[in-house]
Amino acid sequence: MLNLSLDEVKAYAADYTAVPVAKECFADMVTPLGFLATVKNSSSDYFLLESLENDENWSRYSFIGFDPVLKLRCKDYEAEAVSGSAAVKFTTVDPLEKIKEILAEYKVPAIKNLPLFTGGFVGYFGYDFYQYCEPAIKFDKAKATDFADFDLMLFDKLIAFDKLKQKIYIIVNVKTDNVEVNYARAEREINAIEAMLNQPVKPKPFTRANLGKIKSNQSREFYNNSIARCREYIKKGDAFQIVYSQRFTAEYDSDL
């Protein structure tokens, strides 16, 4: 049984563009990592979101999502939005506005007994994203990596593992533009995910991974000289804080 009836979702439709509906299950036999192994067999785009509180304690929820409704990435002002088999490429100097525009389609209410995160963008913003916030900053493209400036996936459904109550919430956001059709679709998706949760997980055989030699993008001499320059800038008052970094890379022959 879902947490909200069709009539309750319709009541939200006047003020919200989407409503998260959910089914509650017991989590006594399923773990986030175990379910992730099942997800990997059916989807190539997925995430597991964990977090710590006070740097030492696991937070209450673990989130898993798969099959995003949209993928959005950008590098050097050239962006691409992919939804299903359709892809659109465009140039942008302000990708944050595009992200806000997309999220405006998902104005959702906070639903009692559900976590605050019930869907949205998941991904990363790289260091080079700063150039969109400060146009005066120019990065050396010759030293750039192959990573995108940002790479995001938009999820309208996810699975939340509640460690406190030992429960699982299967959450699907119902768009309110065609609420009856979308509510029925959400029911089907929730039932399908519940069936996935009930699938037995076969443990993978243990394999030892090999980590190659760790390399820096700077020599020790260059790094030390750069730190000395940073200290001089601070002494002269040109800067009050500088976070200097170097990039480390290594070959890895397994699946992270």
Describe each region flagged by the PLM.
Residues 1-256:
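Extended alpha-helical targeting/anchoring segments
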